[in-house]
């Protein structure tokens, strides 16, 4: 049974909105006071340990476990949770949008269903709900379905073939990207399954004027880190032995004991390095790296196979390539302060005037963390941690800071925030970036 942590919203109160009390002040155990408004109350689940790579991403509902419901200001509601057959919940997931007495079923018997974004501007001209659905447990990939949140909701776009999808304003420049991978194109490639790979080819997408564009080349530092990580796992001996093989590594190939598994790992990492170059828009560097590391006798075959696989994947669904914005031309999204509560000042605030909060604060969609393992980790997890989060306009955590006089940091909790999902803050009906305080403690 999953354990959970309870979280309490942390808010600064002030006599007026100009109060600038330090955000770094130590935070004691939080209790709601009469008249004080909390940003939100959340629960953080401890995930059961798993070795399955495909389950490394957090989703709202997996095999009938987990649920989420929310309503947008237009009256359109979303529900993701266990599918119901009569009065019974099943081991599959359902997702639906509803408005008034109408209902739009997105999936009613899926292995996984998830809300990635809700009320977010993806560049399609309307606030949207982005849901991802995996139809069966044996399938490799998700379908990413984007619906308008105007009544009645309309399916605006579907992207197929990624193992996961995650919308985020990565650089806090006001533009939202969709991070995914080209998993469907490489599933079974060279007899390698997705669970054999460290990662499928990463991709970064972005909508502009309704067109789905490839923005991967704008995030080359991300790809460079992936390349460096894979190169660090290879030795000169590994590469030399692989270069002297036939490249195919067919089961019937005569190799010394232990070599097939080792060379298979080398082959996998060489492919991952080449993919990172190719998918980040550096084809010349990719083909050069392939020639340096792949057996010469098999080079033409593998190059043709890579090209053939790419045209079957997400690349075939794109409308073009995003044009990078120069560093000097980039906007910087305003980060609204959700740590201050504006309250009436006795004797100064006119009667009948209610102070207005600058933003509608974020609300959690999904917050999960892996279980602590060691005694020290368990002790840290049982104590309250106070976090300062910056949440972007797509509802993803862009930065996290542990507040207070803490001796040790719960590293597992901090790391897990990278996969947390929120309905973003809103200002004047528009999704915005915000910063909030969040107190997290073990639910008792």
What is each PLM-predicted segment?
Residues 35-49:
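Bacterial N-terminal signal peptides
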Residues 327-444:
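Charge-biased low-complexity segments
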């Amino acid at each position: 049974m999953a354990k959970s942590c309870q979280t309490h919203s942390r808010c600064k109160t002030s006599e007026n909105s100009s109060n600038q009390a330090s955000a770094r002040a130590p935070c004691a155990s939080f209790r709601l006071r009469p008249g004080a408004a909390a940003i939100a109350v959340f629960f953080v689940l401890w995930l059961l340990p798993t070795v399955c790579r495909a389950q490394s991403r957090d989703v709202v509902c997996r095999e009938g476990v987990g649920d989420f419901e929310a309503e947008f200001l237009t009256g359109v509601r979303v529900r993701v949770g266990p599918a119901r057959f009569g009065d019974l919940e099943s081991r599959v997931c359902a997702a639906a949008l509803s408005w008034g007495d109408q209902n739009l079923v997105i999936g009613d018997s899926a292995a996984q269903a998830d809300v990635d974004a809700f009320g977010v501007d993806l560049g399609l001209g309307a606030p949207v709900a982005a849901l991802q659905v995996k139809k069966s447990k044996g399938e490799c990939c998700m379908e990413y379905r984007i619906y308008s949140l105007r009544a009645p909701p309309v399916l605006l776009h579907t992207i197929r073939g990624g193992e996961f999808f995650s919308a985020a304003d990565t650089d806090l420049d006001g533009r939202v990207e969709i991070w995914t991978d080209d998993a469907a194109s490489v599933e079974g490639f060279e007899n390698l399954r997705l669970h054999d790979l460290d990662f499928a080819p990463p991709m970064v997408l972005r909508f502009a004027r309704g067109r789905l564009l490839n923005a991967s080349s704008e995030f080359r530092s991300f790809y460079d880190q992936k390349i460096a990580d894979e190169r660090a796992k290879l030795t000169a001996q590994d590469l030399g032995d692989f270069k002297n093989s036939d490249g195919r590594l067919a089961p019937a190939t005569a190799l010394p004991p232990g070599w097939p598994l080792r060379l298979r790992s080398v082959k996998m990492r060489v492919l991952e390095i080449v993919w990172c170059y190719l998918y980040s828009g550096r084809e010349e560097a990719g083909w050069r790296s392939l020639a340096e590391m792949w057996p010469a006798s098999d080079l033409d075959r593998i190059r043709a196979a890579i090209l053939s696989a790419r045209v079957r994947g997400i690349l075939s669904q794109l409308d073009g390539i995003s044009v990078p914005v120069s560093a000097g031309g980039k906007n910087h999204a305003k980060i609204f302060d959700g740590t201050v509560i504006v309250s009436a000042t006795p004797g100064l605030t006119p009667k009948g005037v209610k102070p207005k909060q600058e933003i509608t604060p974020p609300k959690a969609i999904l917050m999960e963390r892996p279980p602590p393992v060691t005694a020290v980790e368990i002790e840290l997890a049982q104590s309250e941690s106070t976090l300062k989060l910056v949440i972007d306009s797509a509802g993803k955590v862009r930065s996290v800071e542990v507040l207070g006089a803490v001796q040790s940091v719960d590293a597992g909790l901090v790391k897990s925030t990278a996969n947390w999902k929120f309905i973003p803050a809103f200002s004047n009906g528009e999704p915005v970036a915000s910063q909030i305080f969040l107190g997290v403690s073990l639910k008792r």
